[in-house]
Design a protein with these regions (language model features):
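The AdoMet/dcAdoMet-binding core of the Class I SAM-like
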Residues: 1-88, 104, 129
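A generic structural signal for alpha->beta connector loops
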Residues: 11-13, 35-37, 92, 118-120, ...
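Low-complexity, flexible helical/coil segments
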Residues: 27-30, 49-54, 92-100, 131-135, ...
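Residue-identity detector for glutamine
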Residues: 29, 52, 87, 110-112, ...
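Generic alpha-helical propensity signal that fires on short helical segments
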Residues: 32, 56-58, 77, 113, ...
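C-terminal substrate-binding/active-site "lid" region of AdoMet-derived donor-dependent transferases
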Residues: 69-75, 79-143
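SAM/dcSAM-binding transferase cores
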Residues: 112, 128-177
C-alpha cells in the first residue's frame, strides 16, 4: 500500500493494526525505506479504535481471516466495526471497506444495516477481483468524478486497473443470477 501512496504524494503516518505481526515484519524487511511511515500496533482492531483519543479523516477496514485456501470477512467486519468506524470518523471523514462476498457470491445480510450508517456511499468494482471497495461518508463526489480521479491516479501508477474499474452509487449490488 505504501508504494502507491508515496507515488501519489502522501507523506503522513499510517497506523496499521493487526493481531498477527507477520505481515508488518515482512513489510519492514522488504521495504525498510518506508517502514518509518507505518506505525504498527499488535492489537484487536475494535479495541484499538475504541481506545484512540482522536477521530480520523480516513479509516480503512481491510480485515480478513484465512480459511482453507481462501479468506473471508469475519462477522465483526459486518457488525461491530462499521458502527465504530462511523463513530470515530470526523464529520468530513471517509471510510473505506474492502468487502468480500460469501462463497456463493451473495453479499451477507449484515451488509444492509451497515450501509444505513452512512448518508453517502459508492462501490468500486475491479473487474479482476471478487471483492468490492465500498467508500462511505457524509458527502462524497459523484461517481463520475470519483471514477475520473481514481482512473487518473491509477494511470499515474501505471496500473492496469485504471481501465478495469466501474463505480456506482450505493452499496454493492446483489449478484446477478
Amino acid at each position: 500500500m505504501m508504494a502507491p501512496l508515496l507515488k501519489l504524494g502522501f507523506n503522513g503516518i499510517i497506523d496499521a493494526v493487526d493481531l498477527d505481526p507477520v505481515g508488518h515484519r515482512l513489510f519492514a524487511q522488504h521495504c525498510p525505506g518506508w517502514a518509518d511511515s507505518v506505525r504498527f500496533t499488535k492489537a484487536d482492531a475494535v479495541d484499538w479504535l475504541a481506545g484512540q483519543p482522536r477521530d480520523f479523516d480516513l479509516l480503512i477496514d481491510d480485515l480478513s481471516v484465512p480459511r482453507d485456501d481462501d479468506v473471508f470477512k469475519p462477522d465483526i467486519s459486518w457488525t461491530v466495526l462499521p458502527s465504530l468506524i462511523r463513530q470515530r470518523l470526523r464529520p468530513e471523514g471517509t471510510a473505506i471497506f474492502n468487502l468480500l462476498p460469501e462463497k456463493t457470491g451473495a453479499w451477507p445480510e449484515q451488509l444492509q444495516p451497515m450501509t444505513r450508517l452512512f448518508p453517502s456511499s459508492q462501490t468500486v468494482h475491479l473487474s479482476d477481483f471478487l471483492n468490492r471497495i465500498w467508500i462511505a461518508g457524509n458527502a462524497l463526489p459523484r461517481p463520475a468524478t470519483l471514477g475520473f480521479r481514481l482512473r487518473h491516479s491509477l494511470q499515474r501508477l501505471e496500473s492496469r486497473q485504471a481501465q478495469r474499474i466501474r463505480i456506482h452509487s450505493g452499496p454493492p449490488r446483489p449478484k446477478r443470477t
